[in-house]
Every structure is written in structure tokens, then in C-alpha cells.
């Protein structure tokens, strides 16, 4: 398919959802390029994100739509959405308010391996999850 034909397809037609109706979305800070998180989107959450310019995902554990920041206030303003060459992965470029990670860090990728076995924290703690979400039982 030539470039002109490819760009004429609608964005939503190009997205290849998996057998569960989901597509992975990598989330990146639009200014720094830092990867903040990975989440899943279904058609409804993707349409909502496109409409509101606020990141909305599909929670597999809760089996419902999840507007990022609805509990914590740590919203993601969406600046751009890119799709990969296969159409099966999205990249959201966002402005992150507060931390992206539910355990309080700026990025969900807040740990790195030191020697292949041990880990160290390599990111900034932005909030105390107990203060934001309450104590989890």
C-alpha cells in the first residue's frame, strides 16, 4: 500500500485490536521522551481519549474504563497518539500531572537492575499512595 493510500485509511480502522479487543499503549512524556507506563486500550477508551484529549484506558483487573487520574488527580493530557508499523501498538505522548505510577513514582519503570539480580530505585517518588488512595486491605 502506498503512502497516500495508507494515510487515507482512518486512524481507528488502522488499529489492530487483539482477540480480547485490546491494544497496548505505551505512554511517554511529550517533552522529555521518558516512558511513563504501559496500559491497555479498547475501542471505547481510545475514542474517549481522542475526544477528551485525556488518557483513558481499559483496566483488565477491574474490567472497566479507567480515566487516568480519576482517583489520584494525576491526569494525563494527550498531545499526540502514534501507531506502530504493524498497527498493533500505540504510543501516547502526554503531559503527566503528578506521578504516572499507582505506587507513587513519576514512571511505572522506577526500578532498574544493578547487577542482573538486585534492583535499585531510579525515579522520583511523587506522592504517597496511602494518602491518595487510602490503605489497601
UniProtKB/Swiss-Prot annotation:
Q: How is the cofactor bound?
A: Binds 1 Mg(2+) ion per subunit.
Binding locations of Zn(2+):
85, 101, 108
Q: Which reaction does it catalyse?
A: 1-(5-phospho-beta-D-ribosyl)-5'-AMP + H2O = 1-(5-phospho-beta-D-ribosyl)-5-[(5-phospho-beta-D-ribosylamino)methylideneamino]imidazole-4-carboxamide
The UniProt record gives the binding positions of Mg(2+) as: 84, 86, 88
Q: EC number(s) of the enzyme? A: 3.5.4.19
Protein family per UniProt = Belongs to the PRA-CH family.
Q: Pfam families, per this entry?
A: PRA-CH
Q: Does the keyword Zinc apply?
A: yes
Q: Gene3D superfamilies annotated for this entry? A: Phosphoribosyl-AMP cyclohydrolase
Protein's UniProt name: Phosphoribosyl-AMP cyclohydrolase
Q: Which pathway does this chain act in?
A: Amino-acid biosynthesis; L-histidine biosynthesis; L-histidine from 5-phospho-alpha-D-ribose 1-diphosphate: step 3/9
Q: Which GO terms describe its cellular component?
A: cytoplasm
Q: Which cofactor does it need?
A: Mg(2+); Zn(2+)
Q: Which species is this UniProt entry from?
A: Chlorobaculum tepidum (strain ATCC 49652 / DSM 12025 / NBRC 103806 / TLS)
Q: Per the UniProt entry, what are the Gene Ontology biological process annotations, in alphabetical order?
A: L-histidine biosynthetic process
